[in-house]
Amino acid sequence: MKLEKIIKGITVNEIIGDASQEISGINMDSRLIEPGHIFVAVKGTQTDGHTYIQKAIEKGARTVVCENLPETLIENVTYIKVNDTEDVVGKLATTFYGDPTSKLELVGVTGTNGKTTIATLLYNMFRKFGYKTGLISTVCNYIDEEAIPTDHTTPDPITLNKLLGRMADEGCKYAFMEVSSHSVAQKRIGGLKFAGGIFTNLTRDHLDYHKTVENYLKAKKAFFDGLPKTAFALTNLDDKNGLVMTQNTKAKVHTYSLRSLSDFKGKVLEDGFEGMLLDINNVEVNVQFIGRFNASNLLAVYGAACLLGKKTEEVLLALSTLRPVAGRFDSLRSPKGYTAIVDYAHTPDALENVLNAIHEVLNGKGHVITVVGAGGNRDKGKRPLMAQEAVKQSDKVIITSDNPRFEEPQEIINDMLAGLTKEDMRKVISIADRKEAIRTACMLAQAKDVILVAGKGHENYQEIKGIKHHFDDKEVLRDIFANE
C-alpha cells in the first residue's frame, strides 16, 4: 500500500521525503521493523520510541512517524511529523490493514469485573448460532477455532488491527473484545468502529496507572463517548456509574438490571453449586453458572445478543447450554467432600462478589476458607482492602503471594495484614509459598466446606523478578486431590 494512502486519514504537520513509496508493514517496536516498514515513534509509559528512530532505520524502516524530528535526517527516509503519535498509530494501522471493523460487527466490553466472561460467552454463543466469530480477551484471542495466546487485555493498536484484519479475511461476521481502561487511555482502540459497547461495573482497580478513581472512570466513559450513532450502548443499572457511562454517548442506550426496571430485567429464582434458575424478562431459564454477579453477566450477554438481532428464544436456549469461562468460578470437588473454587477475583469488589455467591449457595451448611494474595508493582491501596474483604466473609483466611513481580512477597503480605485488627488476625495465616498455602487450605477443609483460591484464575504462571514460572491453581488442587 502506498504511504500517501495510509496517512490520508490523519492530520500531518510536515512531510519530509517521498510519500508515494510502497509500504510493507507498520510497527511501534524497532526490534520488529523489517525493510519497507513504517516506524511510529510513540512515547510510552516506560520508554520513548523517539530514542529508537535510528535503530528502526538501520533495520530498514522507510518511513518514520514522529512528534519531534531527529537532529539528523537520513536520505531516502520519509519523515512525517504529527502532534500525537499515540493518537495516530491506531488510525494508520486501521487503514493499512484494510479497515477491518467496517467488515465486522465488533462489540466492546468494558468495566472492572465481568469483561472476560461476557466477551467469551458472546463468542461461544455466536459460534453456536453458526457464525464465524472472533474473540479478543485476557485469557486468549480466537479467530473462530484458532487460538492465539495473549499478553494484554487489549493488544497494541497494530497487533489489534492485524488480528481484526485476519478475522475479517477469514470470514468472521462478529468479534467480541475486552476493552481495558489502559487501552482507552493509551488510544489503542483508535480507528476502530464498534457496533456496540457493554458496561459491566466500576470498582477500585488499576490506580497504580490511573492514580484516581475519577481518572479510571473517565477512561471507561471515553469508550462510550466515542461510540457512533449506529451502535448500541448497553449499561448496568445496578452499578451507580451505569448511567454516567452513557450520558454523553451518541449510541442508542439500553439497560440491564437485577434490581431495577430496565430493558433487560433479570431475577435469580434458585441458586446452587450446579447452577441457577433465572427469570429474564419474565421467561425462566436454567443456566450452568453460580452467583448474582454471574446472573448480571448473563443478562448483559442476553441483552447484547438481542441487540445484535437474535431472537429471544434462540438466545435463551443458547444461554442454557453455555459453560463458565476458565478461571471464573471454576469449581472442583475433592474426594473428601469439600469444594474448591478457582477464581480470577483480584479486586476487593470481585472478591466480595465471589464470596457472596459462595455464601448464597452454602447457606450456613459449611465453612469458607479463602486463599488470597495481591499483585506486586500494582495498586498498593487495594491490598489491605482485599484482606479485609476476605476476613469479613471467611472462617479462615490464608494470605499468600500472587505475581509478586519485582516486590518481596512478604512485604506485599505485610501490606495486606496492615488492614486487619487483632480480632481479624485470629482467622488469618500467612504463607508466602502459594502451593503450600493451597495445600494448607485443603488440610483444614472438611466435608461441605468451600475453599476459594482467588486472584489467578486462568493464569498458569507466577511472575517473579521478571520471569514467569509455571504455576496453575487448578493443577495444584488436582495434585492434592489425587493424594487424598
Curated annotation (Swiss-Prot):
The organism's taxonomic lineage, starting at the top: Bacteria, Pseudomonadati, Bacteroidota, Bacteroidia, Bacteroidales
Function, as annotated: Catalyzes the addition of meso-diaminopimelic acid to the nucleotide precursor UDP-N-acetylmuramoyl-L-alanyl-D-glutamate (UMAG) in the biosynthesis of bacterial cell-wall peptidoglycan.
PTM summary: Carboxylation is probably crucial for Mg(2+) binding and, consequently, for the gamma-phosphate positioning of ATP.
Family: Belongs to the MurCDEF family. MurE subfamily.
Reactions catalysed: UDP-N-acetyl-alpha-D-muramoyl-L-alanyl-D-glutamate + meso-2,6-diaminopimelate + ATP = UDP-N-acetyl-alpha-D-muramoyl-L-alanyl-gamma-D-glutamyl-meso-2,6-diaminopimelate + ADP + phosphate + H(+)
Keyword Magnesium attributed: yes
Enzyme Commission number, as recorded: 6.3.2.13
Binding site for meso-2,6-diaminopimelate: R378, D402, N403, P404, R405, G455, E459
Entry keywords, A to Z: ATP-binding, Cell cycle, Cell division, Cell shape, Cell wall biogenesis/degradation, Cytoplasm, Ligase, Magnesium, Nucleotide-binding, Peptidoglycan synthesis
Short motif Meso-diaminopimelate recognition motif, span: 402-405
Name of the molecule in the record: UDP-N-acetylmuramoyl-L-alanyl-D-glutamate--2,6-diaminopimelate ligase
Organism of derivation: Phocaeicola vulgatus (strain ATCC 8482 / DSM 1447 / JCM 5826 / CCUG 4940 / NBRC 14291 / NCTC 11154) (Bacteroides vulgatus)
One Gene Ontology term, aspect cellular component: cytoplasm
Cofactors: Mg(2+)
Keyword Nucleus: no
Metabolic or biological pathway: Cell wall biogenesis; peptidoglycan biosynthesis
Record-listed UDP-N-acetyl-alpha-D-muramoyl-L-alanyl-D-glutamate binding positions: S30, T153, T154, S180, Q186, R188
